[in-house]
Amino acid sequence: MKSFIRMTLTAATAALFVACSGGESRPDSGGGSIVLGFSQIGAESEWRTANTASIQSAAPEAGITLRFSDAQQKQENQIKALRSFIAQRVNVIAFSPVVETGWETVLREAKSANIPVILTDRAVEVSDKSLYLSLIGSDFVEEGRKAGRWLLANTKDIAGDINIVELQGTVGSAPANDRKKGFAEIIAAEPRFKIIRSQTGDFTRAKGKEVMEAFLKAEGKKINVLFAHNDDMAIGAIQAIEEAGMKPGTDIIIISIDGVKGAFEAMIAGKLNVTVECSPLLGPQLMQAVKDLKAGKTLPKRIITKEGIFPMDVAAKEFPNRKY
């Protein structure tokens, strides 16, 4: 089936297309299947697996042909995938960038080829914001703030300093940078909250466990709170805490982000205190954005997903509603 982007446009239609798009490239509004090239970070967490499943199931439902690439958490693999999509002349490129920087050159190549780019889940740092059309996903700074607000509200009765250890996400990634920023912004209001250790766990359970073991060896019972940038690291850390003879969720307050089923199971077991939602189910929103481009519509620069926060006491009630 021919890609609609290769169909011949009349001069009048082409002129109208440019006028509607404000000078930015768009797929044309002709018939035929839309081909979307998508580069995924990898499969580092339960969240990412659900995100991939959402995109892969939403594409055929929307009548979109998906060309999918797994970067195995390496930026060089994502850049190769984007260049492959450009060479294949896909209609739209979408990707979730493993880190924020280092994309300028390949995004300029996509723009030169008149292939629009949509970001999902994570942002990029580029000098020219026209290199991508839209970012679909969560407000990571606000997620960090939600975690911080919950901590302040739920430790009012605890006297003295509160020592926090932090499991950061992948170094240089948007969620790691922004969740840290939002959390630090909120706890700065009370000097008694002190981050005594902070290290990357790379968003994985195995690394989360390994780093938490090091935190416990260095600080032991001085640790009052663990703030993990995602649920998988928190779940790994829970294992380390238990192996150290302590009770997660009681001896150490544990706050994490994502809202995956594993986190709800940990809360039901009394081992995790709260999870801040970060929905991976971006597939339908992405496919709608791609179809809107085909129809000649201009996308909002930022499309933010609506998300909540789930403390331990609501976990059992909410668990049957979880889709990931």
Language model features by range: what are they?
Residues 1-35, 60, 108-115, 317:
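Short, low-complexity disordered leader/linker segments with a strong preference
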Residues 30, 36, 78, 135-162, ...:
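Hydrophobic alpha-helical segments within soluble ligand-binding/sensing domains
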Residues 32-34, 167-175, 186-187, 278-324:
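Hinge/cleft segment of the Venus flytrap/periplasmic-binding protein
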Residues 47-62, 143-147, 174-193, 207, ...:
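Short, solvent-exposed amphipathic alpha-helices that sit
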Residues 95-112, 183, 197, 201-265:
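Hydrophobic alpha-helical
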Residues 101, 105-142, 163, 260-266, ...:
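Flexible loop/hinge segments that line or gate small-molecule binding clefts
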